[in-house]
C-alpha cells in the first residue's frame, strides 16, 4: 500500500492556497489553478502545510487521498516554478516554427500541420527541430506534448519522428534476406 497521502504538501512562500467547500484554489507567481476535491478526502490547511485525510468508511478513500495529494502537489509546484516539456523532431525535413500562438509542423506529410495551443500553454522553438512547452498545469503540458508527438511517433527502424527530449527509442534491426 502506498503512503503518499500521509505526507503533507508544504506551501512555499508566495503561494496562496484557499479551500471553499470542496474547491481548492492555488495562486502563485506563475498563475492560479483550481481543482474540485473528491468527497472521500478531507483537506486541512494549517501551519503552511496541506494535509489530506480519508473519510472514514468511504470505499477507496486512501487511494483518493493519495491521488489528491499528488495532484495538489503538482498544482503548488506549477504555480511557483512551472512545468516544461521538451520535444525533438528527428528526420530529414522535419521542422517546427511558431506562428502566433500556433505551432506549424512540417513532418513529411503532403501538407503542414498546425497545432493550436490551448490557453495556459506557451511554446518556444529554440531551433527548427526543438519545441519547448511551458505552463503551470502539468496535465495540460503533458497532453499537448502527447498530441504533438502523436502526429508522427518515433518509428523503430530509423528513429524518425517526434520524440520527448528524454525518450529512448528502442531500435529494431531490418530484416535480412
From Swiss-Prot:
Quote a single Gene Ontology cellular component term. Answer: cytosolic large ribosomal subunit
Q: Which GO terms describe its biological process?
A: cytoplasmic translation
Question: What protein name is recorded for this chain?
Answer: Large ribosomal subunit protein uL6
Task: Give the gene symbol.
Answer: rplF
What PANTHER family does this protein's entry cite? 60S/50S RIBOSOMAL PROTEIN L6/L9, LARGE RIBOSOMAL SUBUNIT PROTEIN UL6M
Q: Which UniProt keywords apply?
A: Ribonucleoprotein, Ribosomal protein, RNA-binding, rRNA-binding
Q: Note down the stretches annotated as region Disordered.
A: 152-177
Taken from the record, one Pfam family name reads Ribosomal_L6
An MF annotation (GO) of this entry: rRNA binding
Would you identify the family this protein belongs to, as annotated? Belongs to the universal ribosomal protein uL6 family.
This protein's assembly is summarised as: Part of the 50S ribosomal subunit.
NCBIfam families, per this entry? L6_bact
User: What is the stated purpose of this protein?
Assistant: This protein binds to the 23S rRNA, and is important in its secondary structure. It is located near the subunit interface in the base of the L7/L12 stalk, and near the tRNA binding site of the peptidyltransferase center.
Locate the compositionally biased regions of type Basic and acidic residues. 152-171
Amino acid at each position: 500500500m502506498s503512503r503518499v497521502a500521509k505526507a503533507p504538501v508544504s506551501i512555499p512562500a508566495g503561494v496562496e492556497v484557499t479551500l471553499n467547500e470542496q474547491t481548492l484554489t492555488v495562486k502563485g507567481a506563475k498563475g492560479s489553478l483550481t481543482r474540485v476535491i473528491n468527497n472521500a478526502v478531507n483537506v486541512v490547511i494549517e501551519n503552511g502545510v496541506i494535509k489530506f485525510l480519508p473519510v472514514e468508511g468511504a470505499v477507496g478513500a486512501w487511494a483518493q487521498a493519495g491521488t489528491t495529494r499528488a495532484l495538489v502537489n503538482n498544482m503548488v509546484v506549477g504555480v511557483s516554478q512551472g512545468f516544461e516539456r521538451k520535444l525533438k523532431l528527428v528526420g530529414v525535413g522535419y521542422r517546427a516554427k511558431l506562428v502566433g500562438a500556433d505551432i506549424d509542423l512540417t513532418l513529411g506529410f503532403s501538407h503542414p500541420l498546425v497545432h493550436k495551443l490551448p490557453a495556459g500553454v506557451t511554446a518556444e522553438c529554440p531551433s527548427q527541430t526543438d519545441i519547448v512547452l511551458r505552463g503551470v498545469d502539468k496535465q495540460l503540458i503533458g497532453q499537448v506534448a502527447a498530441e504533438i508527438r502523436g502526429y508522427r511517433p518515433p518509428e523503430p527502424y530509423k528513429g524518425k519522428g517526434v520524440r520527448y527530449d528524454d525518450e529512448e527509442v528502442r531500435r529494431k534491426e531490418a530484416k535480412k534476406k
